[in-house]
Amino acid sequence: MDYTNNGPLKVVYGDYTFGVHGSGFDYIFSYAQGGLESIVKDGCEWLYRCPKPTFWRALTDNDRGSGFHLKSGMWMAADMFMKCKNIQVAVDGVDQGFPCAPQNNRYGGDVYAYEAKISFVYETITVPSTEVKVDYIIEKSGRMKVEVHYFGKEGLPQLPVFGMRFLMPSVAEKYIYEGLSGETYPDRKAGASQGIFVIDDLSLTPYLVPQECEMRMDTKWVEITRVKQGLHTLRIEANDSAFAFSCLPYTAEEIENATHHEELPLPRRTVFCIYGAVRGVGGIDSWGSDVEDAYHISAEKDIKFSFVIA
């Protein structure tokens, strides 16, 4: 099938997948995995695992000193394990319900649309539990808006971060972004300058103990480049407001498990996390002082953010 840049989307109702295809892009959503299973842009696959909500960043020396991990440690478990409890599909604004087999048999032949939307609702394993809703909205141009909504719940401890984690198949060659210079956090960005910056080394900051690092605040867009039979680039843009992100070769859990840098595995993936909320890192001292109240993230309040995969 030949598509034009502004032509209709081809929608495929699989038994256990929902596909949206167009000129130079393919998106596949897995009902079994509970998320976006594949992003292919110009023949390059960008996903190794389904993106999921993320609640945890690796601890810092200041976190350990203040005992933050003892108060909020359940968010690390929530970051690793969650239940996808609901999936809904809408095409051109018409609710299609959950069209897995055998309900998908009602769609015969090629199906085309101008917009497709699929929503996933995740339940956390925290006590008490709460929910996160993620909406993927694909436009006919191939741009995909991602809307993320965390539902606050009374009784939950403070969050380290809240965002979405994308695990990519190989280590990125570099990334370019427009935002604040250097490593920045909500309470550590006063000296940063706005600009466009190129980062061609995804290594961790060489602290004595591997820990949280390389956050980039107030970002308007980021382009990640990787090699697969040539250079390929994936662009993520802010939607309503700027976002924070990190782009590292390790998950927070891998960093957490290492007490020395030589204990980290060889880099083999890109872990790209985009955040709607980030806790400060403190630094008043490392033996008990908490982050200032203004830089806490309440888990009892709703958090919403959105971005665009261009």
State what each model feature region is:
Residues 2-310:
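Beta-strand/loop-rich accessory regions of lumenal/periplasmic or secreted enzymes
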